[in-house]
Regions:
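Intrinsically disordered, low-complexity Ser/Thr/Pro/Gly-rich regulatory segments
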Residues: 7, 21, 34-261
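Acidic, Ser/Thr-rich peripheral helices and adjacent loops at domain boundaries
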Residues: 24-32
Length: 261
């Protein structure tokens, strides 16, 4: 039986006279760390398959990194079109059925065709579109997830890079999680109870032994409110030695957030 000693940021053996356990001998999961600090993680967040690697995103990342701001706009338009498809993996969109329901249709269609061409060349989709319809298939569930929201691809890339960091041929981070939604009091109430909940989502959390690394990912610039959220959550659920990291595809070094970071 062990207990977590917040003052010492370590563990003590409750059976052996509170003897301190070496940090190297203790490895916590993200869920265990949050639970020890009084919170709980909401279930069902998507996690990439265990055998995924950064190479799986190489082509897609080329498209995103070339034009991060354009990517945000493209994904908003893509989702507007794809929301009208019965399947989200094998997309089929007859244009005659869409034209009357989407504003500025011609410009958006042109943008999407241009994007699909880029994704086709990078191996993200199999594009079979014609003049009458947009028709394409995502080449994996992981790649499909990365286009559901503009920021997903940066989160996934960060997570996969973390999984592959090694020290002496051993994974440096023992547990890696993304889209971690934390309930602050550890009690998940039924929505019908109408009890106010305090929750925050952290893009990526990596665990090295008992030390968590809280990461905020932004496909674009970072506002000061993101700095505040990251600091607050890490301080509450990470202990005194928690580490924090901001990752942004475009960071204005003159912005207040950049100066504070």
């Amino acid at each position: 039986i062990v207990k977590f000693d917040h003052a010492a940021n370590g563990f003590r053996d409750c059976i052996r006279d509170n003897a301190r356990i070496k940090a190297a001998d203790v490895h916590l999961t993200v869920e265990e760390m949050i639970a020890l600090c009084g919170g709980t993680i909401l279930p069902d967040a998507y996690q990439p398959p265990a055998d995924s690697s950064p190479r799986d995103l190489a082509g897609l990342w080329d498209v995103v990194s070339e034009a991060p701001r354009d990517w945000n706009r493209w994904i908003m338009q893509l989702r507007e079109f794809e929301s009208r498809s019965d399947s989200q993996m094998q997309v089929f969109l007859p244009l005659a059925h869409l034209r009357g329901g989407i504003s500025d249709f011609d410009r958006k269609e042109e943008n999407i065709r241009s994007l699909l061409d880029k994704l086709q060349r990078k191996g993200v989709v199999d594009d079979r579109s014609s003049a009458a319809a947009l028709e394409y298939t995502y080449n994996s569930r992981l790649l499909r997830f990365c286009t559901e929201k503009a920021g997903n691809v940066l989160e996934v890339k960060t997570l996969l890079e973390g999984r592959w960091v090694q020290q002496k041929d051993v994974p440096y981070f023992g547990d890696c999680q993304m889209s971690v939604s934390i309930d602050w009091d550890g009690i998940v109430h039924d929505p019908g109870e109408r009890i106010p909940e305090t929750r925050n989502e952290i893009d990526v959390i990596l665990m090295h032994g008992t030390v968590p690394l809280f990461i905020s990912c932004k496909n674009g610039n970072i506002g000061e409110e993101e700095l505040y959220k990251l600091h607050t959550v890490a301080e509450r659920f990470g202990g005194p030695y928690a580490k924090k990291m901001l990752i942004a595809t475009e960071l204005d070094r003159k912005s207040p957030a950049a100066n504070r970071a």
